[in-house]
């Protein structure tokens, strides 16, 4: 069975379905630090203006006082990649695929199933804090490595910020899809192409119930197709021709 890892997103939208917020044990230490920070501290940690930091401070304090509601993560996150993932009117098989084979990597919650209930928050591995004297990446590395050992065949749709959260020896069977546009024989890639394509790729995997590495090679989605000559065992390249 294939396991997919996808990143979080800064952009969020509140879905209809809500749950009580139950925070994993490993996240408690992070919450304690974040909830105690001033708006000035948060502005520095996030590299944002203090006005924007006030909103984040309220979110952390609401979590600490157990006032926060939680929402299925794949519905709450609404960045460009998420908007290109099929999230509504799923078949029973697609719903099972999304909730059993797709996991979200978070610097606050750890690695969670796509439908895990989470609260509104802003947090990533660039957030400037120390947890028990460690960087966020060092703090989460044992948890992330354990997940990798339990799920050896991972399809990673993660961005570069996650490259050194996992230890290298845990990623021997990983495959990272790469998405490129071709125009007049020239190949190019950029953030917008990649984010949209990640969502479309995951949707195609769900719709086709892909369970093997070879099945990924026959996918055609949003104009992209697998390019064997540019691909390697660990990087599958998908090309979309532009006019």
Swiss-Prot record:
Any single biological process term in GO: response to hydroperoxide
Pfam families the UniProt entry points to: H2O2_YaaD
Gene Ontology cellular-component terms listed: cytosol
HAMAP family associated with the record: UPF0246 (MF_00652)
Family per record: Belongs to the UPF0246 family.
PANTHER family with a match to the protein in the record: PEROXIDE STRESS RESISTANCE PROTEIN YAAA (PTHR30283:SF4), PEROXIDE STRESS RESPONSE PROTEIN YAAA (PTHR30283)
Protein name from the UniProt record: UPF0246 protein SpyM3_1790
The organism of origin for this protein: Streptococcus pyogenes serotype M3 (strain ATCC BAA-595 / MGAS315)
């Amino acid at each position: 069975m294939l396991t997919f890892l996808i990143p979080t997103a800064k952009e969020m939208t509140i879905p209809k379905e809500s749950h009580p917020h139950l925070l994993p044990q490993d996240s408690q230490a992070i919450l304690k630090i974040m909830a105690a920070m001033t708006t000035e501290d948060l502005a520095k940690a996030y590299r944002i203006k203090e006005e924007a930091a006030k909103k984040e401070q309220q979110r952390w304090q609401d979590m600490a006082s157990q006032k926060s509601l939680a929402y299925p993560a794949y519905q709450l996150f609404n960045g460009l990649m998420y908007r290109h993932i099929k999230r509504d009117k799923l078949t029973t098989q697609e719903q099972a695929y999304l909730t059993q084979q797709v996991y979200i990597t978070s610097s606050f919650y750890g690695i969670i199933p796509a439908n895990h209930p989470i609260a509104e928050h802003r947090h990533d591995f660039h957030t400037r804090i120390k947890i028990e004297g460690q960087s966020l990446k060092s703090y989460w590395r044992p948890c992330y490595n354990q997940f990798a050992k339990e799920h050896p065949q991972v399809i990673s749709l993660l961005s570069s910020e996650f490259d050194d959260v996992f230890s290298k020896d845990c990623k021997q069977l990983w495959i990272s899809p790469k998405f490129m546009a071709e125009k007049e024989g020239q190949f190019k890639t950029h953030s917008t192409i990649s984010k949209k394509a990640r969502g479309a790729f995951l949707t195609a995997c769900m719709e086709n119930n892909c369970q093997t590495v070879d099945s990924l090679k026959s996918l055609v989605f949003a104009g992209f197709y697998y390019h064997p000559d540019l691909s390697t065992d660990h990087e599958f390249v998908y090309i979309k021709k532009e006019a």
